[in-house]
A protein has these predicted regions:
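Residues located in well-ordered beta-strands
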Residues: 42-44, 65, 81
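Short coil-to-beta-strand transition motifs
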Residues: 34-41, 73-76
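OB-fold/S1-family RNA-binding modules
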Residues: 1-31, 77, 81-193
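Short, conserved beta-turn/loop elements at beta-strand boundaries and strand-helix junctions
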Residues: 48-53, 85-88
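Beta-strand/loop nucleic-acid-binding surfaces
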Residues: 27-33, 56, 61-72, 116
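Short aromatic-glycine-enriched beta-strand elements
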Residues: 15, 51-57
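Structural detector for short beta-strands of small beta-barrel domains
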Residues: 3, 7, 37-49
Length: 193
């Protein structure tokens, strides 16, 4: 067999994704019980770390560490996103710069502006995609990045994807107060494959 093939399945109730290249296993990804990168939490500020400008926070999945956490006071609720898997015995690595990623679009609430992947070089294609971005985002204060796979995607699918992510971002941003809670689960192997 020549070419690339993505194989999706389940093993012991967990998602599994495999990449086959020219008939050989190239990559394999098993889902775990650990929180997935991209998970968005409403966390509660716990205690600052002097000298580092960071803060420990409480999440439903355990303690997290937030870098550059200036202006936060203990007990304050904040929205954070998991950036990567935590090392054993360490706090979850978190950021306040939340991104809402999907197949075609990335919505950036804290970074306004409409952008298209640099890998799309065809000017006509870029203009078409920019038109879709303008029509779907309107006067929104949120930013948008259209990913490289938009080059071959259907316009309606791109528009639907942008709307879904913008709606999710708007909904999540209104849920800033309250107890620690998982608001959005990160993508698993099937979605990322």
């Amino acid at each position: 067999m020549k070419g690339r093939l993505i194989v999706l399945d389940h093993h012991k109730g967990q998602q599994v994704a495999a990449l086959m290249v020219d008939g050989r296993l190239d990559d394999l990804w098993f889902d775990t019980d650990a929180p997935r990168p991209g998970t968005i939490y409403r966390a509660i500020a716990d205690r600052p770390v002097k000298g580092m400008g960071g803060m420990f926070v409480k999440t439903p999945d355990g303690p997290g560490f937030l870098r550059h956490a200036k202006g936060l006071s203990p007990g304050q609720s904040i929205l954070v996103q998991l950036t990567s898997y935590a090392e054993p015995g360490k706090a979850l690595p978190l950021t306040q710069k939340i991104l809402f990623k999907s197949r075609f679009a990335i919505v950036t609430p804290d970074a306004p502006g409409l952008n298209i992947s640099r890998s799309i070089r065809d000017e006509e294609q870029r203009e078409l995609l920019m038109g879709i971005a303008h029509s779907e985002m309107g006067e929104s204060n949120m930013g948008l990045i259209l990913r490289s796979c938009c080059a071959t995607a259907d316009r309606a699918d791109i528009a639907d994807d942008i709307n879904a992510m913008a709606d999710l971002a708007t909904q999540i941003l209104t849920e800033q107060t309250g107890a620690a809670e998982t608001l959005v689960e990160g993508d698993g192997p099937h979605a990322l494959a």
